[in-house]
């Protein structure tokens, strides 16, 4: 193989004590634009400054390579363990394979800033990819993130596979794969989490969000479309999927082979009404909100792992069009809260659909904001739609 750059040749120690970020960055700089591969051998690499990957760059890590965020450095907005280099004008053809990528959160070090709205605050995310065409992430062991493990926006063409999440300590807003807006044409497959993780949304499709929150600095709102998700496994995550749309569309999403134990939601489509930074306030969106369409969910098994008073495992408080679930199963043998509704649809006037269980079809029609439909227990298929015409 040509143009392989071993970071040891650029001066890394890999002993976990010295700051290896300058040496690794020299290797990344040498690879940029030359279809170069930066090889990171087994070792422990303390990273004191953000690593930046530029155009036409591949990073390949030995399975024994661990890179972690240095706890000794003061953090500021724009700091990460790894980011693409140019989030404004964009990058192309970036690939990262293998290794452990550690946010080094233990409750004492690398803590989330106290002021959620500090415009200069560190986001707390571990990996950052914004404005990238052709991104590949494969075989990454993501560990101990302060907030989002991997945050992304403005992606055009991506493959994310064989990603695992684990943390010694749970943290607030500890999303797994967090997508902001303007994301399209992607494949996500074989995503796993150890019990307890992720401690927020395992996969978040947030076409809309509050951009003044520190977690979302320099992300954006916008359409999320044409994505296939295959093979998502968690024994006890906070929430499996969030689909957050208020004004921007989420469409043409295919999800297959989902196996989730959830403390809160399997699929949350509440429009962020109940967050600390709600996007919909009382008196707004009286005709319904959101734009989620052409969603296919095939072979989903879910169960509740904690009694917490949540409204349902699948919560739809958003306008939906052609949202279809087939091969659904609620694992009642493992479910600790069987009385919790499986499906709840509300705050979506002019919504209609069907739920089929053992050949019996239940139809629903919501005429006003006050109307609600709930289904308890398991079901085989569900078809959810909106009567609105502005999709």
Write out the residue ranges for each language-model feature.
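Extracellular/periplasmic carbohydrate-active domains that bind, remodel
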Residues: 1-391
């Amino acid at each position: 193989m040509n143009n392989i750059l071993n970071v040891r040749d650029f001066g890394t120690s890999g002993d976990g004590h010295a700051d290896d970020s300058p040496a690794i960055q020299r290797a990344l700089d040498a690879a940029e634009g030359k279809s170069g591969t930066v090889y990171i051998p087994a070792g422990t690499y303390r990273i004191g400054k953000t690593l930046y990957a530029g155009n036409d760059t591949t990073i390949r890590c030995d399975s024994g390579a661990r890179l972690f965020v240095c706890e000794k450095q003061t953090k500021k907005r724009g700091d990460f363990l790894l980011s693409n280099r140019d989030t404004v004008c964009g990058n192309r053809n970036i690939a990262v394979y293998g290794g452990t990528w550690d946010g080094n959160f233990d409750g004492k070090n690398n803590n989330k800033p106290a002021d959620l709205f500090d415009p200069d605050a560190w986001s707390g995310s571990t990996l950052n990819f914004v404005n990238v065409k052709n991104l590949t992430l494969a075989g990454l062991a993501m560990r101990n993130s302060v907030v989002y493990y991997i945050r992304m926006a403005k992606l055009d063409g991506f493959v994310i596979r064989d990603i695992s999440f684990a943390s010694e300590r749970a943290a607030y807003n500890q999303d797994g794969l967090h997508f902001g807006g303007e994301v399209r044409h992607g494949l996500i497959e074989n995503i796993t989490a150890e019990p307890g993780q992720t401690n927020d949304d395992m996969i978040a499709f947030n076409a809309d969000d509050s951009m003044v929150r520190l977690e979302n600095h320099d992300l954006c709102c916008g359409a999320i479309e044409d994505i296939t998700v295959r093979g998502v496994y968690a024994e006890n995550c906070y929430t499996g999927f969030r689909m957050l749309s208020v004004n921007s569309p989420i469409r043409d999403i295919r999800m297959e082979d989902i196996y989730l134990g959830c403390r809160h939601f399997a699929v949350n489509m509440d429009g962020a009404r109940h967050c600390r930074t709600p996007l919909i306030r009382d008196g707004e969106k009286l005709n319904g909100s959101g734009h989620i369409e052409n969603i296919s969910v095939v072979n989903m098994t879910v169960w509740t792992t904690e009694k917490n008073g949540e409204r349902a495992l699948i919560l739809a408080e958003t306008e939906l069009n052609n949202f279809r679930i087939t091969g659904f199963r609620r694992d009642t043998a493992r479910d600790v809260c069987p009385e919790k509704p499986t499906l709840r649809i509300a705050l979506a006037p002019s919504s209609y659909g069907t739920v089929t269980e053992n050949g019996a079809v239940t139809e629903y029609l919501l005429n006003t904001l006050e109307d609600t439909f709930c289904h308890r227990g398991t079901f085989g298929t569900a078809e959810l739609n909106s009567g609105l015409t502005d999709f």
